[in-house]
Amino acid sequence: MNPNYLDFEQPIADLEAKIQELHTASMGPSINVDTEVRALENKLRLRTAQIFRNLSAWQISQLARHPRRPYTLDYISVVCDEFQELAGDRALADDKAIVGGLARIGHRPVMLIGHQKGRDNKERLMRNFGMPKPEGYRKALRLMKLAERFGLPLLTFIDTMGAWPGIDAEERNQSEAIATNLIEMAELKIPVICTVIGEGGSGGALAIGIGDRTLMLEYSTYSVITPEGCASILWKDAAKASDAAEQLNLTARRLKEFGLIDKVIREPIGGAHRNPQQMANRLKAVLLNELEALDKVPLVTLLNQRHKRLRTYGAYENH
């Protein structure tokens, strides 16, 4: 099976392969396959729509990790008209799992911070598979405070399995770095918009995820643990990940129903990886609209609303 396709995408892969074969055949003399190609392309559109209309939570979890899914830097290249990356935590190192810097979206200057995974093995190792160490979160905090100093709105793109759990991270106080970010983000005197673009995993996601608006792409996830991790703990069997995904209620649609996020941003048919340009344009439009709306909110009201949001997380009623 093509590694760029998930198992449930195999019918799509087969149709695309047939279309490619016909295109190759049409390069020969006196061969016209336009009618057949159009028929297959129509079938492809219908089959793709059918598959993506009925996705399970586990399938959405797989899409959130799709190897071709756009990452933070991919979105930055389209969403931002200008971007100047800033590096380092000014204490130890520059964690490549977190990228951030000054940006301009349209006429709007902003600070943008996000998790960054890698495309190939070399980059995955350099980016630590998108799992930040304490210095990554301290770099993020440095940029947040810089944004506050200059009155720049803060945008964060969330896409991580979680914070790095290695001994080196624990030695440098990973939990303190995450906790400090949570405290500081709750009090930032600037508008903050957080967008889950892929995986939103546990405290590693929350450490750049406290804000005035929380958005999720349609096929992203947000959870306290991965489905595999949950299955290993509850059932001692990672193969039950699909059951765990359902129980975790980690999809954008379910989280919107619970009131834990503010907006679900629709993805192109087949997912963001099938049309990254279109997805980035949609994201840009939504971010500009949200920034404009937050411009009208007085700072005191903004902070009060942010604190109220945080206090409602985890609240429930007995029936």
Curated annotation (Swiss-Prot):
Catalytic activity: N(6)-carboxybiotinyl-L-lysyl-[protein] + acetyl-CoA = N(6)-biotinyl-L-lysyl-[protein] + malonyl-CoA
Coiled coil: none
One cellular component (GO) term of this entry: acetyl-CoA carboxylase complex
Record GO biological process: fatty acid biosynthetic process; malonyl-CoA biosynthetic process
Top class in the EC scheme: transferase
Pathway: Lipid metabolism; malonyl-CoA biosynthesis; malonyl-CoA from acetyl-CoA: step 1/1
InterPro entries: Acetyl_CoA_COase_a_su, ClpP/crotonase-like_dom_sf, COA_CT_C
Keyword tags: ATP-binding, Cytoplasm, Fatty acid biosynthesis, Fatty acid metabolism, Lipid biosynthesis, Lipid metabolism, Nucleotide-binding, Transferase
Primary location: cytoplasm
Its EC number(s): 2.1.3.15
Nucleotide-binding in keyword set: yes
Domain CoA carboxyltransferase C-terminal: 32-293
Keyword Lipid biosynthesis listed: yes
GO MF, any single term: ATP binding
Subcellular localization, as worded in the UniProt entry: Cytoplasm
Role summary: Component of the acetyl coenzyme A carboxylase (ACC) complex. First, biotin carboxylase catalyzes the carboxylation of biotin on its carrier protein (BCCP) and then the CO(2) group is transferred by the carboxyltransferase to acetyl-CoA to form malonyl-CoA.
Quaternary context: Acetyl-CoA carboxylase is a heterohexamer composed of biotin carboxyl carrier protein (AccB), biotin carboxylase (AccC) and two subunits each of ACCase subunit alpha (AccA) and ACCase subunit beta (AccD).
Family: Belongs to the AccA family.
HAMAP family: AcetylCoA_CT_alpha
Protein name as annotated: Acetyl-coenzyme A carboxylase carboxyl transferase subunit alpha
Lineage of origin: Bacteria, Pseudomonadati, Pseudomonadota, Gammaproteobacteria, Lysobacterales
